[in-house]
């Protein structure tokens, strides 16, 4: 299934930085932290996180920053998306040399000219040095689009999960709402192989703060908001909900699945 991904972060006031004074040594370049929001079409990429070969969103962004600064630049994302998954509001931060300080609203244009059309910077703001895109995040939102059309519209290819079988949207909504709250989501997690060993007690407990099901024509949108998610957790929950709507599985508390 394909989805969209967004991150909510704590609001931060603009940071303060001084430009280097004339004659100052360039041995250590003062840096300014910037919070960026990006949107991207995930189809051409192997996910967010950097990998050998450079075909990820992070790799493409870092090349754009490095080209602009003339020096290698590492960015830090608020979360990771899998291959083919899109984002409407992926937050990340970068540290820019003070020599490149420009008004915050000029950063999107400066970077977008160096990026492919499938990636766009939509917002930038200066933040204090203690801000971290991952650790300052207060919530994450994932949205999945399901097409119920008998024949998938070509323009939905790669953007919607095709499920033309008959199922009740009302029961789908009931199933999705069962995931609200704090539960043990072991049944909705795929192990990467890099989990801490032994796995700590409570590792699979997660809190979902909001769920929503909306229908527009032949499209159904499922939205989950939470403080954090396990690997492939949202994809597995989205896959289970229509099965409950079809009656192939019963509605149960997710902690007992």
Q: Which residues fall in each region the model found?
A:
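Short, positively charged and aromatic/hydrophobic N-terminal segments
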Residues: 20, 24-27
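Structured-RNA-binding interfaces characteristic of tRNA pseudouridine synthases
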Residues: 28-257
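Extreme N-terminal basic, low-complexity initiation segments
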Residues: 2-11
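Alpha-helical transmembrane segments and their juxtamembrane interfaces
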Residues: 8-9, 20, 92
């Amino acid at each position: 299934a394909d989805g969209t991904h967004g991150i909510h972060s704590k609001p931060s006031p603009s940071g303060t930085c001084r430009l280097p004074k004339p004659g100052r040594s360039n041995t250590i370049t003062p840096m300014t932290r910037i919070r960026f929001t990006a949107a991207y079409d995930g189809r051409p990429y192997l996910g967010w996180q950097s990998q050998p070969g450079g075909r990820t969103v992070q790799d493409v962004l870092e090349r754009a920053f490095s080209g602009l600064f003339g020096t290698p630049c590492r960015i830090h994302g608020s979360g990771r998306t899998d291959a083919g998954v899109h984002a409407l509001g992926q937050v990340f931060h970068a540290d820019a040399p003070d020599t490149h300080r420009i008004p915050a609203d000029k950063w999107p244009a400066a970077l977008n000219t160096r990026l492919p059309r499938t990636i766009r910077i939509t917002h930038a703001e200066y933040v204090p040095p203690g801000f971290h895109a991952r650790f300052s995040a207060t919530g994450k939102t994932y949205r999945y689009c399901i097409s119920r059309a008998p024949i998938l519209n070509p323009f939905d290819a790669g953007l919607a999960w095709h499920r033309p079988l008959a199922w009740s949207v009302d029961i789908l909504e009931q199933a999705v709402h069962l995931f609200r709250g704090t539960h043990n989501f072991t049944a909705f997690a795929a192990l990467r192989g890099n989990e801490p060993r032994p796995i700590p007690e409570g590792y699979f407990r997660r809190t979902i703060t909001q769920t929503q099901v909306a229908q527009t024509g032949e499209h159904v949108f499922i939205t989950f908001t939470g403080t954090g998610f396990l690997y492939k957790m949202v994809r597995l929950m989205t896959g289970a909900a229509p099965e409950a709507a079809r009656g192939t599985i019963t509605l149960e508390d997710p902690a007992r699945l």
